[in-house]
Amino acid sequence: MSECFTVMGDHIELVAGCYEQIVFGYRVCPADEEWTIEPTFTHHAHTASLNAVSSSNQFIATGSKDETIQLYDMCKKTEHGALLHHDGTISCLEFYGTSHLLSGGQDGLICVWSTKKWECLKTIRAHKGQVTSLSVHPSGKLALSVGTDKTLRTWNLIEGRSAFIKNIKQNAEIVLWSPDGDKYAVVVNDKVDIYTLDSATIIGTIAFTKRISCLKFLKNSLLAVGGDDESVRIYDVTSQKCVCEFKAHENRVKAIESFMKDDFCVLVTASNDGFIKLWKLNLESIESPTLLGQLNTTARLTCLCVWMPGETKETAEQPAQATTSEDVLDPLVPVRSKRVRILGEEVIMEDEKGSKTQGKKKKRQKVQ
């Protein structure tokens, strides 16, 4: 999710992707003085550069320009298969809890995957261009997406339909819910627009100095922003004022993550300069953070996530290995129609053979 994780033990791992097609795993080892970051695995995961990585309490998913999503069981430290459905670059990934993974791609699709059997439950024709970013509401009932068709779209995940479309006149690169889900941030080039959920209108704008590449809500009122100017800035979301600024790297900042440790926040940054750095930050009295530890991966990093183990319930049926999913409908939201037009927006669902219904415009039908 978008807020700081709370660490219940000392098992913290960082997973990073890079232009060189490699996935790196590192264990964070806290100490009284300098923290250390120790390598746990290196895997040549893809045949093209990585664009996205996301974590649940058991799995890591990575997305690449090679059109595949690769899965890893972090508890067993083994590969868990690949998801093959998108036609084009995988641009964004997000787990919701332990049950679902959402993926967005260059093909304009958003796919909803079940993590139990790694089936594609639903395929949504989300944007006319590329899906550049998506974010799931903390409740799991809504999702936001932005794309190269200059629209911001809200999706009803319970009914599997488009709920709202907003023309934003520019292509947005990032969309992100706040931890409380009462607001969300949308990045367009060098600015962040803050929207309220109630009215879906902009309540403030944060102006950055250069192009923005990453965002992280440290808590509902604090937003960390990184981009092409090597610095990280932390903003008060209500006033849109910068409350902290520090130089984090020697090159552009590509990813920001965070987790809580004891009474402070650990900010994790990754850059094209190859470094992953850990910063100690007090969220109650914001001051320049202290560098806890760093590691030079010698790779051009593109994405990063924090992984921590969670409790998993033993079941008689073990999760299946991931394969290409082409013939599954969502058991929670049965789809009777293949082409659904709701409030003027067309949503195309998979039929039972993975094909799409073609033909002329039909009468409006409802998702049951």
Swiss-Prot record:
Q: Using the record for this protein, list the coiled-coil segments as residue ranges, or answer none.
A: none
A single Gene Ontology MF term assigned here is: protein kinase inhibitor activity
Keywords for the protein's UniProt record, in alphabetical order = Nucleus, Repeat, Ribosome biogenesis, Signal transduction inhibitor, WD repeat
| Presence of the UniProt keyword Repeat in the record | yes
InterPro entries annotated for this entry? PAK1-Kinase_Regulator, WD40/YVTN_repeat-like_dom_sf, WD40_repeat_CS, WD40_repeat_dom_sf, WD40_rpt
- One GO location term (cellular component): nucleolus
**SUPFAM superfamilies in the cross-refs:** WD40 repeat-like (SSF50978)
One BP annotation, GO: ribosomal large subunit biogenesis
Q: Where are the WD repeats?
A: 45-82, 85-123, 126-165, 207-245, 248-289
Subcellular location field: Nucleus, Nucleolus
Is the keyword Transcription regulation in the record?
A: no
Which Pfam families did the record assign? Answer: WD40 (PF00400)
Function according to Swiss-Prot or TrEMBL: Negatively regulates the PAK1 kinase. PAK1 is a member of the PAK kinase family, which has been shown to play a positive role in the regulation of signaling pathways involving MAPK8 and RELA. PAK1 exists as an inactive homodimer, which is activated by binding of small GTPases such as CDC42 to an N-terminal regulatory domain. PAK1IP1 also binds to the N-terminus of PAK1, and inhibits the specific activation of PAK1 by CDC42. May be involved in ribosomal large subunit assembly.
Its name, as the record gives it, is: p21-activated protein kinase-interacting protein 1-like
Species the sequence originates in: Danio rerio (Zebrafish)
Name the encoding gene, please: pak1ip1
